[in-house]
Amino acid sequence: PRPTWISEPTTDMDGDGCRDSDEDDNDDADDFEDSQDNCPTTYGTSTLGRVGCTDSDLDGWADSHDDCPVEYGNSSQNDKIGCLDSDGDGWANVDDAFEYEPTQWTDTDGDGYGDRQEGVDADSCVDDSGDSYADRKGCVDSDGDGYSDPDSSWDIGDGADAFENDDSQWSDFD
């Protein structure tokens, strides 16, 4: 007997000659079996966010989860997924205060020193913007000589500026 079923786009989406309803485990021919495919009737290459869905920029993130669906990207932190991340720290360049330094990504006080104490050029005074760099980085330096002004947690004995209003002197050892 001759089969009565005829392959048509509505019953054989991928055109492989098999009836999708009972003979084909991969209806869209995208290498993801229907049981694992979040988009079983749409050809897709995504492996992140949703498996087997459209990934226009080929970065692995399904367009529906990709904040930059037409720009290849590897960001996975904060609120920007699948966007350009030049230093590979997970933070998209647009949200990364240090886009080429993988150990730092935020600078709460905006002084150019990173908030992460474990990172390169860590800010010693995260909540207070400052220009100091000699004894501590990123703390208030009233006279601009590089040494931070003394405060309740860092005094002259620790290396703070002994002359906080005189940029020609910063220590007094006698």
Residue ranges and their predicted role:
Residues 1-174:
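Extracellular calcium-associated, cysteine-rich motifs in secreted modular proteins
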